[in-house]
Design a protein with these regions (language model features):
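Membrane-interfacial amphipathic/re-entrant helices at transmembrane-helix boundaries
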Residues: 1-17, 46, 56-61, 87-93, ...
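Single transmembrane alpha-helix segments in multi-pass membrane proteins
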Residues: 2-52, 76-91, 230-238
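Helix-loop-helix "hairpin" substructures at the membrane interface of multi-pass membrane proteins
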Residues: 11, 133-214, 238-244
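Transmembrane alpha-helical segments in multi-pass inner-membrane proteins
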Residues: 15, 55-66, 191, 195-201, ...
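Alpha-helical transmembrane segments within multi-pass membrane transporters and channels
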Residues: 22, 56-99, 106, 243-248, ...
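Mid-bilayer segments of alpha-helical transmembrane spans in multi-pass integral membrane proteins
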Residues: 70-71, 75, 96-114, 134, ...
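Extracellular/periplasmic helix-loop junction at the C-terminal end of a transmembrane helix
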Residues: 101-132, 257-264, 281-290
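Cytosolic-side transmembrane-helix boundaries in multi-pass membrane proteins
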Residues: 110, 174-188, 258-306
């Protein structure tokens, strides 16, 4: 049980990196990017291609791929996403769904259907682990991924809180019209958000390829996991995204103790439970009653009946 909790905690770091970009893009541009998981796979295959064809270390390849992913995000926002911002919710969904299909088939044409991994390029690190008291085995790569997740989210928090660009992003996310009246350049903000979001997707894809295998059509599964982590943790909070990723990872690890197929099922059940609770609270709020029938609710009903 303890080992499963630790493994779930570390898995949450990967989910946090994966979900942060999805949450940022939705928070700033109100776009649910259905190609987010496929962009993560693009980043993974980019790192794999550099390591296989040029003999680069995975870490150096990752450092080269991340700026390219950021440029891809800027290009997508400028030539694709920007044209759908004022078209309602359906068109962005259709456009990003189509983008995901294009990316999947492009990767299939370039790399085939065979699953790939960065394990061999990492050498001993791919299998290295620490033994904790009680005989608990913890892999070094999951720990590194979790540390990277905390560092990345901390850096993003500093960016959003202490820089002019960050304040512009937060203003555009909270009230786009008021931000525009205050002189915030929406196009600049959207491009920055898209660059960060797609780079984070690429980072998550590379982290996955270091610990497991990736294949061209694996994007939709990653999208579901990212979406669940965002909903569980709450949209608009970076540390909430980390919490959502950790809760999702712990649920999956505990589910795997019950049965192998329980890994994904437990995560889905947690997502549905949290989503149902949020919808119930929203419904109670819309009715003008407290979400929980505590003493304030009882007192309010007594006053109303009097």
């Amino acid at each position: 049980m303890t080992e499963a909790l630790i493994q779930g905690l570390l898995l949450g770091g990967f989910y946090a990196i994966l979900a942060a970009g999805l949450s940022l893009m939705f928070g700033v541009m109100r776009i649910i990017n259905l190609a987010h998981g496929d962009l993560a796979i693009v980043g993974a295959f980019g790192v794999i291609a550099l390591t296989e064809r040029f003999g680069l270390s995975p870490w150096l390849a990752l450092a080269l791929v991340l700026p390219v992913m950021a440029l891809i995000g800027i290009a997508l926002q400028r030539w694709l996403f920007a044209r759908t911002l004022r078209a309602g919710i359906l068109l962005p969904l259709l456009v990003t769904f189509g983008l995901g299909a294009v990316l999947q088939n492009t990767l299939y044409g370039a790399f085939g259907s065979e699953a790939r991994s960065l394990g061999s390029a990492l050498g001993d690190l791919a299998w290295a682990s620490w033994e904790l008291p009680g005989g608990i085995i913890v892999g070094q790569l999951p720990v590194i991924t979790f540390v990277i997740a905390v560092a990345v989210l901390g850096a993003l928090q500093l960016l959003l809180s202490h820089t002019a660009l960050g304040r512009a992003i937060r203003a555009a996310a909270s009230d786009p019209e008021a931000a525009a009246l205050c002189g915030v350049d929406a196009r600049r903000v959207h491009r920055a958000a898209a660059a960060i979001a797609v780079a984070l997707a690429g980072l998550a894809g590379a982290a996955l390829a270091m610990q497991a295998t990736v294949e061209p059509y694996g994007g939709p599964t990653l999208l579901i996991q990212a979406f669940e982590a965002v909903v569980i943790g709450g949209i608009g909070s970076l540390w909430g995204t980390l919490l959502g990723g950790v809760l999702l990872g712990v649920a999956q690890s505990l589910g795997a103790l019950w049965a192998p197929q329980g890994f994904q099922l437990a995560g889905h059940l947690l997502f549905l439970a949290v989503l149902g609770a949020r919808l119930w609270r929203h419904h109670r709020h819309q009715l003008g009653r407290p979400a929980l029938p505590g003493w304030r609710g009882l007192r309010a009903r007594k006053v109303a009946s009097a």
